Amino acid sequence: MIRAGIIGATGYTGLELVRLLKNHPEAKITYLSSRTYAGKKLEEVFPSTLENSILSEFDPEKVSKNCDVLFTALPAGASYDLVRELKGVKIIDLGADFRFDDPGVYREWYGKELSGYENIKRVYGLPELHREEIKNAQVVGNPGCYPTSVILALAPALKHNLVDPETILVDAKSGVSGAGRKEKVDYLFSEVNESLRPYNVAKHRHVPEMEQELGKISGKKVNVVFTPHLVPMTRGILSTIYVKTDKSLEEIHEAYLEFYRNEPFVHVLPMGIYPSTKWCYGSNHVFIGMQMEERTNTLILMSAIDNLVKGASGQAVQNMNIMFGLDETKGLEFTPIYP
């Protein structure tokens, strides 16, 4: 059995990790940490978890002794120094601290210097693109939720030079859980209910992550114009992407079917069928649809994911499976919740 620990176990992604790992046939939870609720049983704070493990403050000695893998479900900037204290434990970080090739990009967008970053061997944890590297990784930077939806939607088109990478327009909509479990007026029920609003326009921190990975795929410089929106639902991301092309929809669709033919979690929809966030609710599945706007030679791509599962904790478990030589669908085989 894989001994798994979670730091930040009482945030939304941490709780989702608890749910997934409790139902994983090859893993068991051996360490849970929460600064806010240290000393309490998890089920005292969140009865739905049915988990009687006691939450503790972070203790690197306990982690090294009791864990084979540690999931760090902390805000950006909080994991880096903790991880550097650990030896002999595989790390899957759900924050942004290990996602970037260039620490200067992280410094520019997240405002923190990562001392010694170049000495840490890390892999960007998007299995559909980096499966082989993940197999031997010691530290995995789990992708962000928006980048997961956008990169998977664009990867085949950029890989096969089917679209112009110079300017990619992304309009994305996310459920409120994407903002994390925090007290803020913007996320009160009366503020988000029956409301739709953009946020972090032209300055969202996920943009450089998208451009880094999409640039690797295409081999060219990629420019992403990204506008996220908050919608009154708990889970889910729907990304709609606009990109220029001189190819036919049929050719592009066939390329997508071939690219994702053997991927267990990515589903390319028939032409004329468009994805819904309801289809992936509570699951690790991704649905991709497409249409051509022929007047302007614009390919419109649409992708739907659950931001807490494939966009965070489910993808982290998928990475764990790969790192430990398991079938990557282990513990993730369940179908989405519907309705």
From Swiss-Prot:
**Active site at which residues?**
145
Q: State the CDD domains in the record.
A: AGPR_1_C, AGPR_1_N
Q: Does the keyword Glycosyltransferase apply?
A: no
The pathway this protein participates in, as annotated, is:
Amino-acid biosynthesis; L-arginine biosynthesis; N(2)-acetyl-L-ornithine from L-glutamate: step 3/4
**Any one GO cellular component localisation term in the record:** cytoplasm
EC code(s) of this entry? 1.2.1.38
Note the InterPro entries from the entry.
AGPR_AS, AGPR_type-1, NAD(P)-bd_dom_sf, NAGSA_dehydrogenase, Semialdehyde_DH_NAD-bd
Domain of life per record: Bacteria
Catalytic activity, as annotated: N-acetyl-L-glutamate 5-semialdehyde + phosphate + NADP(+) = N-acetyl-L-glutamyl 5-phosphate + NADPH + H(+)
> Which terms under GO biological process does the entry name?
L-arginine biosynthetic process
Q: Which Pfam families match?
A: Semialdhyde_dh, Semialdhyde_dhC_1
UniProt lists the family membership as follows: Belongs to the NAGSA dehydrogenase family. Type 1 subfamily.
Q: What does this protein do?
A: Catalyzes the NADPH-dependent reduction of N-acetyl-5-glutamyl phosphate to yield N-acetyl-L-glutamate 5-semialdehyde.
Question: Which protein is depicted?
Answer: N-acetyl-gamma-glutamyl-phosphate reductase
> Organism source for this protein?
Thermotoga sp. (strain RQ2)
Q: Which gene encodes it?
A: argC
